[in-house]
Amino acid sequence: MGQHGAIRLQNEVQEGMPPPHELTEEEQWAEEHRKMHEKHKGHEAMHMEMMVIFMISVIVGQIFLVTWKRKHFKSYQMCTLIGMLTIPVYVCFNRSWYRFLATWLVFCIFSAFIWLKASAQHISGGTPRFVYKWFLFLHKLSYVLGVVGYLIMMGALLGFHVLFGVSQPTLMDAGILFMFYGVYYGVLGRDFAHICTARMASRIGYYTPEGLPKKHLEDGVCAVCGGRLDDSEHVHDADAVVTTKMVEDEDEKLYKLSCGHVFHEFCIRGWVVVGKLQTCPYCKERVDLQRMFKNPWEKPHLFYGKLLDWIRYLVCWQPLIVTAVQGLTTWMGLE
């Protein structure tokens, strides 16, 4: 009798208990992590084989990419651009990240418009400066987004999230989001700028990849855009900025390179900083960037450009290498 009463009391307590609460995102991640450890327990040797395969694949892939870029740069550049445009879009579409897809669509529409202007048979005098200003704006915008994202991430790590009343993972995700948008569109902008730069300069006629201009550059003409320079302006030294003057109703400086050729500010900045062409647009002489950009606040843009070149490998080629390694390990029966 007592045992039956005890059993009835236990059932009543269980029926009166509240239902289990839904797991939070952190708890779900911890549970999945625990299950994965239980599943792969005792597979240390297999995991070591997979790590060796991955390291060898990364090294071989890096050597292949460097050789490909050195031997056939145009095909490497085009394949990289296609990968940069398609791989993140495929991932975001599968995960229903429509905010990125909307920004990607807007970027592609503007880039297509710029490409059409740069590829026209007859390029107007203001088109080159407009194109370079657009890509220089993208470069600076990506730089600002990257810095803001980095500062937000550092604030999350230092505990500043309590000042905004948000959780640390939320603030960290916001920082990563800003940084991703900055570096991704910065890389795409530099690739588009490099393609448009060479194509537009070849249309104007003062530049060819072989270094033999199609027509002679007259004095007082910018070799990038073909626009006139003010002959009355006075050059102070070989690498100094010429006195500010009005160029098409805008205050714009002139730059004179060590080779003696003078260019509009936005033209040479777009050519060197954004277009990644560190040579004179006319005579192919190498440009000394340290002497050209003397102000300390200008040099981070150059370092950021080099960082974007490295990010290109992580965004485009690293996912392909990881996918290939996963396919190889699955074919070999490794888990």
UniProtKB/Swiss-Prot annotation:
Expressed in body wall muscles, the hypodermis, seam cells, vulval cells, spermathecal cells, uterine cells and the distal tip cell (at protein level). The keyword Endoplasmic reticulum applies. GO terms for molecular function: ubiquitin protein ligase activity; zinc ion binding. Keywords: Endoplasmic reticulum, Golgi apparatus, Membrane, Metal-binding, Transferase, Transmembrane, Transmembrane helix, Zinc, Zinc-finger. It is found in: Endoplasmic reticulum membrane; Golgi apparatus membrane. Its main location: endoplasmic reticulum. Residues 69-72, 121-143, 190-335 are lumenal. Disruption phenotype: RNAi-mediated knockdown in combination with tunicamycin treatment, which is an inhibitor of N-glycosylation, results in increased expression of hsp-4 in the intestine indicating endoplasmic reticulum stress and activation of the unfolded protein response. One of its GO terms (biological process) is PERK-mediated unfolded protein response. Residues 1-47, 94-99, 165-168 are cytoplasmic. It is a multi-pass membrane protein. The chain crosses the membrane at residues 48-68, 73-93, 100-120, 144-164, 169-189. It comes from the Eukaryota. Pathway: Protein modification; protein ubiquitination. It catalyses: S-ubiquitinyl-[E2 ubiquitin-conjugating enzyme]-L-cysteine + [acceptor protein]-L-lysine = [E2 ubiquitin-conjugating enzyme]-L-cysteine + N(6)-ubiquitinyl-[acceptor protein]-L-lysine. A zinc finger (RING-type) spans 222-284. PANTHER family: FI05221P, RNF121 PROTEIN. Belongs to the RNF121 family. This is E3 ubiquitin ligase rnf-121. It comes from Caenorhabditis elegans.
